[in-house]
A protein has these predicted regions:
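Alpha-carbonic anhydrase
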Residues: 1-168
Length: 168
């Protein structure tokens, strides 16, 4: 798997993440494949997430973007009502490194230019990025960046994961 300016740049085989599928029963009947992941964070502690829970913001929010495999290419799914599903995972800063998140972080320093691509050295197990309490909210929505297509089923976990200040 490759990181491209801090995001996964290719359509990886789910085996690259350590599992063929993500074992999460969300009531969807479509086949989804991981497309990319990225994070949103702010310049102040507690103000980086795009979603809030009961009015509370979090330090950051990780998005794991999936596309519906009934479309041959991810680009075909972007503007379709059933095209995408995004797992939203809140992040707070804690005292210890998050071992799975570290697999991503340790390659950040190797990206010096906006279009540079680096390979992850270790398989990424997405299940290890999901909070222990798998309570989540789901709703139909849109991409949060242009072109803002209304093609996303959002699955946002209520509980956050913790990463270290160094990993932010």
């Amino acid at each position: 798997m490759a990181l491209y300016n801090f995001i996964v740049s290719q359509s990886p085989n789910p085996r690259d993440f350590g599992h063929e599928t993500l074992d999460l029963d969300i009531g969807l009947t479509k086949m989804l494949q991981v497309l990319q992941l990225h994070a949103h964070w702010g310049d102040k502690s507690g103000y980086g997430s795009e979603h809030t829970v009961d009015g509370k913001s979090f330090d950051a929010e990780l998005h794991i973007v999936h596309f519906n495999t009934k479309y041959v290419f991810p680009g075909e799914a972007l503007d379709k009502e059933d095209g995408l599903a995004v797992l939203g995972i809140f992040i707070t800063v804690g005292d210890q490194d998050h071992p799975e998140f570290e697999k991503i972080c340790k390659r950040f320093t190797d990206i010096e230019n906006a279009k540079e691509i680096v390979q992850l050295e270790d398989d990424l197990n997405i299940n290890n990025l999901i909070p222990g309490n798998q309570t989540f909210f789901t709703y139909p929505g849109s991409l949060t960046t242009p072109p803002l297509y209304e093609s996303v089923i959002w699955i946002v976990f209520k509980q956050e994961i913790k990463i270290s200040q160094r990993q932010v």
